[in-house]
Design a protein with these regions (language model features):
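A short, terminal or domain-edge coil/loop segment
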Residues: 85-86, 92, 179-194, 248-253
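Catalytic centers of nucleases
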Residues: 106-175
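Charged, structured surface patches that assemble and position nucleic-acid processing machinery
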Residues: 200-326
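Hydrophobic transmembrane alpha-helix bundles
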Residues: 23-24, 29-37, 44-52, 97, ...
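Interdomain/boundary linker segments immediately adjacent to catalytic/signaling cores
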Residues: 2-107
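Catalytic cores of nucleic-acid endonucleases
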Residues: 150-227
Length: 326
C-alpha cells in the first residue's frame, strides 16, 4: 500500500449545525446588503440557467446527440435488470442532462458570484500567462488571484504540477502589470471539504516549493494549506481554499456560502408553504440530512419558504462532512 507523505496536513471533519445555518439565514434576512446580493445573484442565475438548459438535448433529439457509451448502457442495464430498450431509453435523457450541467455549472457560478463580491472574472486564451486565472481583485497593494475548480476531485498530478509552474513562472509579470509587490493566489474549490479532497490540490503547494529556491521560501508547504515565497522582490502567498473556506475568503464574511445557497434555491426551487407529505428516500442518510424537525414552528424569514428549508440543508451538506440537528 502506498503511504501518503507525512507532510500533507490531516484535516478534521467539518461539522455544520442546522441551528447555526438557520441563525445565519435570519442574520442575512435583515441585512439589506446581503439581501441585495442574493436577489442580484438569483436574477443572474435564472437568466443563465434558462439559457443553458434551452441548449441541452431534449426528448426530440436524435440518439447521437447524447454521446452515449454502449458499455455504460449495457452495464447499467445489467445493474437494473432491464429487459426492454424502452426501459433504459427513459434514463438516457436525465443522465445526459446531469453530465452536461456538471461541466458548465461551476463556471456559471463563478461568473455570477465573482462580481457580486468585488472580483472580476478573467477570460484569456489557452496557454497564455493568464490562462490559469479565473478571478482577480486588486486590493490596495495586494493582487488577489484565483484559479477555480467545480469540485474537490478535479485535479490530477499533471494538472497540479502545471498550475504550480504557471504560478512560479508568471507571478512577477502579474504583479508588475498591476504595480503591486504582493500576490495572494488561491486555488479555490466551489464545494467540498479538505477531508474529501483527493489532495492533488495540496500538491500544488509542494510543487511550488520544489521549484523555488529554499532561501526564497518563507512558509513551506509541509503541514500547511498555504505556502509563501519571494521572487524578484515580489511576495507571493498561495493558498488552497476548499468549499466554505473559499466562499468566506471571496466574500470576506462567514455567511457568503449561505448567501450562495439561498440565491440558488430562490432561482431554482419553486416556493410554497407546504411540505412534501409523501417523501421517500433511497440514499441512506438523506432523511437525516434534509430533516426539518429542528426548525422551530415560528421560524420565519422572507428569503425562503418552508418547503425550501430542506433544500438549504441539502445544499449545505455539500460543503461539510457532517450536518447535525443542533
Amino acid at each position: 500500500m502506498v503511504r501518503k507523505p507525512r507532510s500533507i496536513p490531516k484535516p478534521d471533519r467539518l461539522v455544520f449545525s442546522k441551528t447555526d445555518i438557520l441563525a445565519a439565514v435570519e442574520e442575512i434576512d435583515v441585512d439589506n446588503n446581503a439581501r441585495q446580493r442574493i436577489l442580484d445573484m438569483e436574477i443572474d442565475f435564472r437568466k443563465r440557467i434558462d439559457s443553458f438548459v434551452y441548449s441541452l438535448p431534449m426528448n426530440s433529439a436524435k440518439l447521437e446527440k447524447f454521446n452515449t457509451s454502449p458499455f455504460v448502457l449495457m452495464f447499467y442495464c445489467k445493474q437494473r435488470g432491464y429487459q426492454h430498450i424502452s426501459q433504459i431509453e427513459k434514463d438516457i435523457l436525465p443522465a445526459k442532462l446531469f453530465s452536461s450541467m456538471e461541466t458548465s455549472a461551476g463556471r456559471m457560478t463563478e461568473v455570477v458570484a465573482l462580481p457580486i463580491y468585488g472580483w472580476s472574472a478573467v477570460s484569456s486564451r489557452m496557454h497564455s500567462k493568464k490562462s490559469v486565472l479565473d478571478g482577480m481583485k486588486l486590493d490596495s497593494n495586494i493582487l488577489r488571484l484565483a484559479t477555480l475548480k467545480s469540485g474537490p476531485r478535479c485535479l490530477n498530478d499533471e494538472m497540479s504540477k502545471d498550475i504550480a509552474v504557471d504560478i512560479v513562472s508568471n507571478c512577477v509579470g502579474w504583479a508588475r502589470e498591476t504595480n503591486v509587490d504582493n500576490i495572494d493566489f488561491t486555488y479555490g474549490v466551489l464545494y467540498g471539504t479538505r477531508r474529501i479532497s483527493n489532495k492533488k490540490d495540496w500538491h500544488i503547494l509542494r510543487n511550488i516549493c520544489e521549484q523555488v529556491p529554499t532561501n526564497d521560501i518563507s512558509v513551506p508547504a509541509e503541514n500547511n494549506w498555504y505556502c509563501a515565497f519571494s521572487k524578484s522582490d515580489i511576495h507571493v502567498k498561495v493558498s488552497v481554499r476548499i468549499g466554505v473556506d473559499w466562499w468566506d475568503y471571496l466574500g470576506n464574511n462567514r455567511n457568503t456560502f449561505i448567501e450562495i445557497c439561498v440565491a440558488l434555491i430562490r432561482a431554482c426551487v419553486v416556493a410554497t408553504n407546504g411540505v412534501d407529505p409523501d417523501r421517500q428516500f433511497t440514499i441512506a442518510d438523506m432523511e437525516s440530512i434534509v430533516s426539518t424537525d429542528i426548525v422551530p414552528a415560528d421560524y420565519n424569514v422572507s428569503l425562503l419558504q418552508r418547503n425550501q428549508y430542506p433544500w438549504l440543508f441539502f445544499l449545505a451538506k455539500h460543503f461539510c462532512d457532517d450536518i447535525i440537528d443542533e
